Amino acid sequence: MAKRETKTDRRLAIAYVLVQAIILLLLIFTNISFGVSILKLAWPGIILEALGVIGVLLSAYSIRTSLTALPLPKEHGQLATSGLYRYVRHPMYTSVLVFALGLAVSSGEPYKYLLFIGLAILFAYKSKYEELYLAKKYAGYRQYANQTPKFIPLPRQKETIK
């Protein structure tokens, strides 16, 4: 394969990961109370957190040696279409979002809901960026993308990868 990405591409990929890490660290390690609590449900939040962690572990297991923190495929990586990848193209992102929603729900803090929304927006952009490289690297990716939902395992809506 020709050169995978430019330095600018790699810097943008690293920026996506850094912003993601900052949001997750704020969700996990901050506990700021503004005296307003919305939808604080400890046990449902904990259940969502656990489901998110399980999803991350299952997703990581499905891609094993192809796992990378950057939204750029590994040079010798393989296209994953089994396990949770059979149901959604980005189960790792979905699982992290479920975990993040759990953190927001269990705390009830409005800023954590805003961080969750920010993370969801970040993953929408990050996945679009990542899919450009996946489509270049794997011949079958476009077909897989057209048959498999991006984040939520619902009946397929028409979406075309360019």
Say what each PLM segment does.
Residues 1-81, 98-162:
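Membrane-anchoring alpha-helices and their flanking helix-loop junctions
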Residues 86-94:
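Histidine-centered phosphotransfer motif of kinases
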